[in-house]
Every structure is written in structure tokens, then in C-alpha cells.
Amino acid sequence: MSSIMEKTDVSSSKHSFTFEPSSDEVGKAAEIVDTHENFYDDQGDIDNPEELAELGYKQEFRRQLSLFGIFSISFSVLGMLPSVASTLVFGLWYVGYPGLLWAWLIAMFFLICVSMSMAEICSAMPTSGGLYYAAAVFAPKGWGPLASWITGWSNYIGNIIGQPSVNSSAASMILGAVTVNRPDFVIQRWQWFLLAVAIQCFNCVLACLPTRIISRINGVATYLNTAFLFIAGITILAYGGKNHNFVKGTKIWGDYINTTQWPTGFAILLSFNSPIWTMSGYDAPFHLSEECSNASVNAPKAIVMTAVIGGVVGWIMQIIVAYTLTDIDSVMNTSGSMWTAYLVQAMPPKAALGILSLTIISAIIMGQSALIASSRIAYSYARDGILPFSGWIGTVNPYTQTPVNAVICNCIISILILFLTFAGTVTLDAVFSVGAVAAFIAFTVPIAIRVFFTKDADFRRGPWNLGKFSRPIGLLAVSFVALMIPILCFPSVKNPTAQEMNWTCLVYGGPMLFTLVWYAISARKWFKGPKASAHYKRPGEESSDIVEGVQADIPSSSDQLKIKGDL
């Protein structure tokens, strides 16, 4: 493209005009470009493409996501209502009521630290590759490709597994809703599978739409998710107050019911699985940054907003559930969904069915947002030649200007994973359990390298940064994840059966071991990290040429000032 910005449409006016700049004005425009000021139109179509070019990539997406738009997708990925429903087992099963409250409260602090460290990196390197690009840049000389390879594959495994797990959960809740009015209904595995595939295909269609439409859909979805949370919380409290069924505060804050064979303190750490799994999607703004206006500011803000708002809302929901869960034994011993058993206990069947319906809608919204985020990861990796069939996957659709092929690829992989429904719940749960572990390993690798190996003088901070608190906050984030990853791989008993075993190590370690062997035998010879990472400009360095094949055209100053629109 010869010029990125030759005309700008101002949709709010009715008269056309053309502005021809004087030589002084052209000089001022050049000065603006040199100081990396944001230059984009009111629609957010263009946002400092030279900034992306300095990172080595060509602007291929339309930047139509505002701060609210990118936050909407990220918040939808968290899916607070279905996430609370799905992770109720982790909070209750290990230590009872306190697992709901203390796990969220303590873990939330450290998860926000992780989000802040990630956001700082995002501000400095707002690319779709995100974490794996940063790992290559921060790593000591010679280690960049391996650090990037590990981060990239861990991130992709976490996202590609997390997305079908959401749709499987939604399908399970739909079938579970049938049993509320028909207790004799027996759920068949083929029904579960076909329903999950139908939801997956529906989400695939939505994820293929242009960014502008995706932004609007997820904007509405955010309002719906917020309304559903409010309705669910008020309804639960209303029925609890009507029936005078509130649990005493001393019981929910201090009555530990340790069902594991580990010490109570360790069991509490096991219950951290609930907030960690819920928060494993707040990296979405990083991967959508190339579609976001003012990305170096809005994308990191969206990451932190998602973590803080999601954490607070999630904790409030945990408190509501804890105070209204009068018969904890019946919920913990149910053969079906704990969430369904809890709702039926807390309110009449029709009201329970209504709240369950809202949870299902939120889960479907969550699934499409997760597919959007995972497709951007696949696109960015294919752009750098990591994935098989990268030439096809890394293509941007010329009509929608979104990575449609990456969406289709991830949809196919998700459907293949859903075939594990026929292998039984133990196998399915084992696969779906690795999502949070894989995601947080990917989150932490670049943060750890930044904290321990990268000098402050070598880190070109973005406009959103932590200043002098960067390293301390990063150290807290890395320490928390380093502690939790092994713990999340433990079973709840000391001599587990196949059903009691935590298969996370095997299910995550197997694919990662395969990728490491692949790297050792073949990939190390041709994979040198993200193609553009070698062109990252550190403080004091001159701008380097954009890597061949991903060159971005920088508009001239006069081109940027040629504005044609409607007054």
C-alpha cells in the first residue's frame, strides 16, 4: 500500500472538504510521527501504524476496537457467571465454604500482579503475537528462539483447549436444565457431543465477522453479562432472604471442611484453581492489540481492567453463593452439576431454570470470545511460520479483514477435542484441566525473563508502565505462579485411583514434550524466534529495517494530513 492514510471519513458531518497542508504543517506532522504520537481517525481505523512497523509487522487489520470494545471481548472471555458455575467444584470440594472466599480474595491480589506485569509488556510491544514475541525480545542472547517456542506453544495449547471446554460446559448445562423439570431424563454422550459441536460452529460464524461487528456484538454481550450477574445475584439473595436461609458468617469464613488427604493449608491452595481457571483469559487484549485503536494504552488498560473487575465481581458472587448455600453436603455429593444442584436448593425450580438459562447464554458468549482470542494467537504464530499450514492459517480475509482461516482451523481442532466426550468424563476433565496451567506458564515466562534477565536500560517502556514498581510486582507475579503450577497438578488424595488422579502433568506435559523434541530435532534449525523480533528497537538503537515479508509502509507526513471527509 502506497499510503496508509490518504483520506479520513468524518461520518458525523455533511459537507466535504480537502485540506492541503503548507510546508510548515508538513514539518509539524513529521515531528509528530518522529515522537510516536498516536494518529488515528475517529473510527479507530488507523492508529500509529509506524509503531507496529517498528516492531517489524505490517498493519493488516482495521483498528476498530476501542478501549471498551477490547475490554468487552476480554471480559466476555472470563464469562464470570458460567465460570463461577463451572469452578464451584474447586472452591467447595477441597475445604468447603472458606475455599470460596479466601481462595478468591488471596489469589485475586497475585493474579492482578500478573495482569499488571503483562500489561506493561503489552504497552511496549502491542502485537498479536504478544507473550511469545516478548519472550524472544527479553531472552538472553541465543535463548530467544527457545523461550519464544515454549511460550508460544504453551499459550496456544491453553487457548485451544480452553475454548472447547467452555462449549462442552455450555452443552452440559443445557442438558442439565432439562433434568430440572424431567428428573428421569438420561443424558446421552452423543447428545452432549452434538450440542457442543453446534455451539462451536455457531461461535465460529460469529468469530469470522469483521472487527467492527465483533466489537458491537461483544459490547452488547458485556451489558448482557453484567445484567445477568446482577439478576442472578439479586434473585439468589431475594429467595435466601424470603426463606431466612442465610449461613452464619462465622461458618463460611472459618468452618473448614477438608475433604483431601493433605493439610488444610495445602487444601486451600488447591482451591485457588477456581480463580486461576477463571482468570486464564485476560491476555485476550494483548492478542487483539493490532485491531485496537491507541493499542499501547488501551490494550494494557483492558488487561488490568479485566483482572480487577473480574476479580471483584467473581469474589462478590462467591460471597453470595457461600451465604445462601445452606446444605453444602447435598451440593458436594450431587452426581450432576454442582451449580444446578445449588440453584435448585436455593430457589424454586422455575427460578432455578431461569438463572441456569442466563448462565448458558453467558457461556455461549464466552465461547465465541475465547475463539476470537485463540484465532488471533494462531494467526500471529502462523505469520511467523510456526504452525503447520502456516501459509493458509496466517492469511487475513480481504473482505472481513480478520483471520478467518485461523478461526476455521481452531474450530476444527476444537471439534476434534470434543470427540473425547465419548471417552468419558475422566478423560474429558483431564484434557480440559490443563487450560489454566498452560496459560499461566505462558503468561509468566516473558515476565520472569524480564524480571531476572532484562536490564531496565534495555527495556523500552510503553506509555502504560509500572515505573519503579515494575520489578517488584513482576517478582510477586512470578513467585505466585511458580508456587501454584506444581500445586495445581496434585490430586486431592495421596493414593489416587484413575478417577481421582490429576492428569494435568501428563496431558500438558505430553504435547509440550513433543514440541520440545520437535524443536531439538528440527525447529531449532529454522525457527529463530518471531520473524520481526530481531528488529525490535531497544533504547538508544536506531530504527532497523522491517523484516522482509512483513514490511509495513509508513505514511508520509503529507499523506497523513490529507483529510477528506464530511462536515
UniProtKB/Swiss-Prot annotation:
Q: Which Gene3D superfamilies match?
A: Amino acid/polyamine transporter I
Example of a GO biological process term: gamma-aminobutyric acid transport
Give the matching InterPro entries.
AA/rel_permease1
Keywords on record: Amino-acid transport, Membrane, Transmembrane, Transmembrane helix, Transport
Where in the cell does this protein reside?
Membrane
Q: Which cysteines are disulphide-bonded?
A: none
Task: Give the superkingdom in one word.
Answer: Eukaryota
Q: Name one GO molecular function term.
A: gamma-aminobutyric acid transmembrane transporter activity
**Would you tell me the Gene Ontology cellular component terms?**
cytoplasm; membrane
Membrane topology, from the record: Multi-pass membrane protein
Membrane-crossing segments per the record: 65-85, 92-112, 190-210, 220-240, 302-322, 353-373, 412-432, 434-454, 473-493, 503-523
| PANTHER family membership | AMINO ACID PERMEASE, AMINO-ACID PERMEASE BAT1
Similarity remark: Belongs to the amino acid-polyamine-organocation (APC) superfamily.
Protein's name according to its UniProt entry: Uncharacterized amino-acid permease C1039.01
Q: Which organism is it from?
A: Schizosaccharomyces pombe (strain 972 / ATCC 24843) (Fission yeast)
Upper taxonomic classification of the species? Eukaryota, Fungi, Dikarya, Ascomycota, Taphrinomycotina
